[in-house]
Amino acid sequence: ITGHYGGNLTHGSDYLTASLPASARSMLGMKEVEVEKNVVEKIANLPEAIVYTQLVKPVLTQKCTSCHNDQKQKGKLRLDTPEFILQGGEDGPIISAGKPLDSELIKRLLLDTNDEHHMPPKGKTPLTDNEIALLHWWVQHGADFTKKVAQLPVDDKIKPVLASYANGE
């Protein structure tokens, strides 16, 4: 029992069952595992959208918080609230506002996928180029948790990314 409890603390409450095949899950009366999809919600009034709340947070929720949340903190890092994002993890702060390439959050996304420090790790759904560009843009312009899209400079690189949110693509 203690080994199982320790595993739950380290790997999350579903670590023993997360990779069970659908047939075994069905036989045990468990729910099917939902396949992760890239869901981009259409934002009707994009200029008035809060960048963190409506653009950044959904990416972190879909791709990062399964390992970095209140119940499971890989690297002692939580990405589920602004306060914990600013706090960083066991290696220190993950955001260097205004300096995306000095920010661990961005650096780890850009590492070679074979690098042991690449995020997300093998077996997890990687971020799309648009999602990485969005996070880069957010950090580049201060990683502010309250600013609206209209309050940040929009260059040619981020325009198509933002357009995808305006169109729900």
Task: Please tell me what each predicted stretch does.
Residues L9-E169:
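Aromatic- and Gly/Pro-enriched helix-to-coil junctions and flexible linker segments
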Residues I1-Y5:
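Internal/C-terminal transmembrane anchor helices
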